[in-house]
Amino acid sequence: MATWITTPAELDAYFQQRPARIGLDTEFIRERTFWPQLALVQMAVGQDILLIDPLIPGMTEALAPWLADESIIKVMHSASEDLVAFKWACGVLPRPLFDTQIGASLAGIGGGMGYQKLVAEITGVALAKGETRSDWMRRPLSESQLQYAADDVEHLFALHDAIDAKLQALGRQQWLHDDGERLLASVANDEDRWPHLAMRSAQFLDAPAQRRLLRLLRWRDVQARSSDRPRSWILDNELAATLARTPPADAAALATLFEQFPKAPRKLAGAVWQALDTPLADEAEAPLALPANDTNKQALKRLQDAVAERSRELGLPDGVLASRKHLESYLERANGRPHWRAGAAGAGVAAAGAAAGTLKRRARRRIAIRLPSKAMKKGDPDHRAALCIPAVRWREDPPPWQRLTSSCSARHRRCAVRCRPQPYSSRSHP
């Protein structure tokens, strides 16, 4: 039977004898805000299940010291969004963290398993899913909501015991610790310096357009955080990409363009214009999303095959040792894997990476982009931009995987865009 906690004193009473671990989960709303609005905190302490009302004044402040206490293990499942909610509401992150979803993946039980499925796999208990989309800000909560909330933490200790035992037997407890620390660090430092790389449309934009897109997305993020509104309510991705690709000549042209987009931020038109037209101090350092070609697809396929073979040897589910995103990052920057994975991947993956780095695409003239990342379909209307991007030197002293030859493979015939080639020199770029 769960206990409803309505005062900080009631919460503190359960920590008079400091527990070795607590189970945690949250319910929150994030439909109309940038930050999640914490609506309920579920906590397992020993044999007790606590349902803590964070809407009561002083409750989040009372909760914060126990979340931050590093002598207490925090057992959670798929914790990333819950961590953001705790950070915003309580000002702290729960650590040390034992994420049962990550742990189940590393233990070879299954990758990306939901809580209900993992509970059924380990304990045999079938849990209901009926209140997933419930209104958790409403008071009082219904009996079915209370039962659903209690179920979310009731079995966390059983999962913790089973998964930790298997990780210990496999010698992978440090793996889980590393991934937990990485997750906590990503939530603590959640401002993405290069948000344009996460947009698929960026790979179809040339270098100046990508920099304009970066300006708009940086501005949008600041506005969303300060006004506590979803990013898409400030400026949606489609409009941002359109503005970056074909910037309006003046403010009047911007207003005309906004008429084509019902959700355009007309009241912020002046700020959008200023953001679009004002270079960032660090935009010259920005990595650019590179289009894919046959060479890159071959390189990615080699790495995927090598990773899949190594994953089978380790008994890991697909995508755990290295996801597609990790491999694309590895190809793009040769730095895509968390550090425990570097050793676990083994020589086979390293060899595949080395082989991928030597692949070259041969067309009418050679392109020597060694290791770009993003996928791109041939025949795309913006394919012409992709063909011309390699003709530009990206930075004065690029790393080996960014070395470029002097001209675009299209030779201006298929794209009708005049490149400004800069000769490649092996002496200036050893």
What are the language-model segments listed below?
Residues 1-22, 26:
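N-terminal accessory regions of nucleic-acid-interacting proteins
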Residues 32, 39-43:
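Non-catalytic, usually N-terminal nucleic-acid engagement modules in DNA/RNA processing proteins
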Residues 42, 47-62, 66-157, 164, ...:
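Active-site-proximal helix-loop-helix substrate-binding element of RNase H-like nuclease domains
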Residues 143, 159, 163-360:
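Accessory DNA-binding and partner-docking regions appended to nucleic-acid-acting proteins
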Residues 360-393, 397:
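Positively charged N-terminal leader segments that act as targeting/secretion signals
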Residues 361, 395, 402-403, 423:
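Cationic, low-complexity basic patches in intrinsically disordered or flexible, solvent-exposed regions
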Residues 415, 419-429:
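Short, intrinsically disordered C-terminal tails of secreted or membrane-associated proteins
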